[in-house]
């Protein structure tokens, strides 16, 4: 029987749901829990098919968002990292009344590079899909290493991410491929342009997966949202710069 892993902790009055990225699970937020728990009621979720949320197969973005929403508090601040940012954004589009505020971290409404849009080359994502079936473990490790590349403690941060993956049940190759498919195909640029939910977009200046140019483009296209680019961070700013990250989240969520 498929069941979503959902853990709640914290002393605050505001509900804050944290959604992790591709290949990982809610353990990735451990350094954030101690910092955020005094201020929020935290909801730590393993996305369907990831970590402790076993029994789910690959699914489209909309289905993933709906499954997560069924267990969510009536109204919350939603924070999504990378793939989790797409899921949180889809939830804000599907059920705006249930989203008090939205925070996306190192995420993009369209991860794939298009003619005039900065992103990951589609053949790179296809390459990862191909390699997954050949060498599952190594491909996940390579993807994790990419996320911390260029930061001061890149190796240490990559080890931490790898530990998070190994600590919980691994997603199946099918689920991982499904996640890459979402990253390759999703394009929420147009729908999110009309979003009325307050939106904060956090980026790392050194991010090799979501180019910092995305921040500037969306500043122009989504003038109602706010962006912050963290100068020495890459794709996992909450791991490389936990205190600065926490400050941004608290300031925005409690404003």
Curated annotation (Swiss-Prot):
Oligomeric form and interacting partners: Monomer.
Cell location: Cytoplasm
Pathway annotation: Cofactor biosynthesis; biotin biosynthesis
Assigned keywords, A-Z: Biotin biosynthesis, Cytoplasm, Hydrolase, Serine esterase
InterPro entries (UniProt xref): AB_hydrolase_1, AB_hydrolase_fold, BioH, Carboxylesterase_BioH
Biological process, per Gene Ontology: biotin biosynthetic process
Name this protein carries in UniProt: Pimeloyl-[acyl-carrier protein] methyl ester esterase
Domain AB hydrolase-1 intervals: 16-242
One family name in Pfam for this protein: Abhydrolase_1
Originating organism: Pectobacterium atrosepticum (strain SCRI 1043 / ATCC BAA-672)
Binding site for substrate: 22, 82-83, 143-147, 235
Family: Belongs to the AB hydrolase superfamily. Carboxylesterase BioH family.
């Amino acid at each position: 029987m498929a069941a979503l892993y959902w853990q709640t902790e914290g002393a605050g009055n505001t509900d804050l749901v944290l959604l992790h990225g591709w290949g990982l699970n809610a353990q990735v937020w451990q350094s954030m829990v101690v910092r955020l728990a005094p201020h929020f009621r935290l909801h730590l979720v393993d996305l369907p098919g990831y970590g402790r949320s076993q029994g789910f197969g690959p699914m489209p973005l909309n289905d993933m968002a709906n499954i997560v929403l069924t267990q969510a508090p009536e109204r919350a601040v939603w924070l999504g990292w990378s793939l989790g940012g797409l899921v949180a954004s889809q939830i804000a589009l599907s059920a705006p009344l249930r989203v008090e505020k939205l925070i996306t971290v190192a995420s993009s409404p369209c991860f794939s590079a298009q003619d005039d849009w900065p992103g990951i080359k589609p053949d790179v994502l296809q390459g990862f899909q191909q390699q997954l079936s050949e060498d599952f473990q190594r491909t996940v490790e390579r993807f994790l290493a990419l996320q911390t590349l260029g930061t001061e403690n890149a190796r240490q941060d990559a080890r931490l991410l790898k530990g998070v993956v190994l600590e919980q049940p691994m997603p199946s190759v099918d689920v991982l491929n499904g996640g890459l498919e979402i990253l390759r195909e999703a394009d929420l640029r147009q729908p999110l342009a009309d979003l009325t939910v307050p939106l904060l977009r956090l980026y790392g200046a050194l991010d090799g997966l979501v180019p910092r140019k995305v921040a500037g483009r969306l500043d122009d296209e989504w003038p109602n949202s706010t962006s912050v680019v963290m100068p020495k961070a890459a794709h996992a700013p909450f791991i490389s710069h936990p205190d600065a990250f926490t400050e941004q989240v608290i300031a925005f969520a409690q404003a």
